[in-house]
A protein has these predicted regions:
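Nuclease catalytic cores
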Residues: 1-130, 158-172, 178-184
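Short beta-strand-loop-alpha-helix junction that forms the active-site gateway
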Residues: 135-154
């Protein structure tokens, strides 16, 4: 085992802020899809959504213990992620609620030898006969890391997770399945 003494790992303030910010971003993207704010015929503007949700995000982060500069940075990251997502054709395609079998935070259970494990898929849908499985990531390149190196590192880090999701859904349907990371 990686941690045979079961010693708790100490999470840095930066890592904890990034994790909490990512959770709020996931919830915001889920709200966009489930509220049908992006469809084949219309799309909410990023500024309208940010203005509508900003106070809610602030309260969520404050309840998690964030204040001052950290709170400001987190809110800026969330707003930028929404602007990037709603401002790009790829982001609007991903968040389009008109896709067939559209779902967010899809929970799948898998029985193992001695227990049951849960996998939660951030975003999935079917378009043109293909099942898409998308995992959102709000991480950022390390200092001095090129964009190409960052993307390669993220793909390597999450490859097994995406393959597990693909295998779980492949057991339930015969259609082709594609997986993707969406870096917000």
């Amino acid at each position: 085992p990686e941690n045979p003494l079961n010693v708790p790992e100490v999470e840095t303030t930066t890592a904890r802020l990034a994790r909490h910010t990512g959770t709020v971003i996931h919830s915001a993207l889920q709200a966009i899809v489930e509220s049908k704010l992006v469809t084949n015929h219309e799309c909410i503007t990023a500024d309208a959504f940010i203005n509508q949700q900003h106070s809610f995000w602030k309260i969520q982060l404050q309840q998690l213990g964030w204040h001052g500069d950290n709170l400001t940075r987190a809110l800026q990251k969330i707003a930028q992620s929404i602007r990037t997502s709603l401002g790009s054709e790829q982001g609007r395609w991903l968040l389009n609620s008109d896709h067939q079998q559209s779902a967010c935070e899809l929970s799948l259970m898998q029985k193992n030898k001695h227990d049951v494990s849960e996998s939660i898929i951030d975003r999935t849908f079917v378009t043109e006969g293909i099942r898409w499985i998308v995992d959102y990531k709000s991480s950022e390149p390390e200092s001095g890391e090129t964009e190409t190196a960052f993307i390669a590192r993220e793909m390597e880090t999450y490859k097994e997770q995406l393959l597990r999701y693909q295998k779980l859904l492949a057991a339930t349907e015969p259609r082709p399945i594609k997986t993707a990371l969406y870096l917000v």
